[in-house]
Regions:
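Metal-dependent amide/peptide-bond hydrolase catalytic core
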Residues: 2-4, 9-207
């Protein structure tokens, strides 16, 4: 039962340089090298464990050939937190590091620039585990002989929860290997999962 929404903010950060030939222009800044330095700096940041806060560089692209000093490279950065204030603080720190990277003499004098574009944003929120909706959801699961688990996630419920409206997300089966090539769901529990979902919808009318 998802009753807490994780706040999310995502960036595409692009490094740009003049580029050049790997031999004749050796020593000229590479967008890939400069972006890699920024990745190391960002991922070295200490993040709070409570509320849980995470950072992930999930994608890197750039360059045109093995013997070319890259003139452009980009990364996609995912920031998450169960706390809105913690996410805002992390966002502030990340943006300051990007701004600082643009003002360093070693980069600015060499013609290196960094640009940050927001490519995704989801607000945080949540309702108490004691809320009637959550109690009904847990009861519907127990009726199927299963023990419910309360958790947080980034789902379609983020928007209503962030605006103070009661909302939740119910799972209908189990699985594993999320976001890997081995991701899977178990088919057998789906029948019970659908039954608990139907029972939950019916029980809402009693509120």
């Amino acid at each position: 039962v998802y009753h807490r929404a994780i706040g999310v903010k995502r960036y595409r950060i692009t490094a740009k340089t003049a580029g050049g030939h790997s031999w004749s222009d050796y020593g000229s800044p590479s967008a890939i090298h400069e972006l890699s330095k920024l990745v190391v700096e960002l991922t070295s940041m200490k993040l709070p464990g409570s509320p849980r806060t995470t950072m992930n560089v999930g994608k890197i692209s750039g360059g045109t050939s093995i013997n070319v000093i890259a003139s452009e490279a980009a990364l996609e950065l995912d920031l998450r937190s169960e706390g809105e204030e913690s996410l805002a603080e992390l966002v502030s720190q990340v943006e300051k590091k990007i701004a600082r990277a643009n003002t360093l003499k070693s980069t600015s004098q060499a013609g290196v620039t960094f640009e940050a574009e927001v490519i995704g944003q989801r607000p945080a929120g949540g309702i108490s585990a004691d809320h009637p909706l959550i109690q009904l959801a847990q009861e519907s699961i127990r009726e199927q002989g299963l023990e419910p688990t309360l958790t947080s996630g980034s789902t379609d419920a983020n928007i209503p929860l962030s605006k103070g409206y009661p909302a939740l997300v119910l799972g209908i089966t189990s699985g594993g290997g999320a976001h890997t090539t081995n991701e899977f769901i178990n088919l057998k529990p789906i029948e019970k999962g659908l039954e608990q979902l139907i029972n939950f919808v019916r029980s809402i009318s009693s509120l």
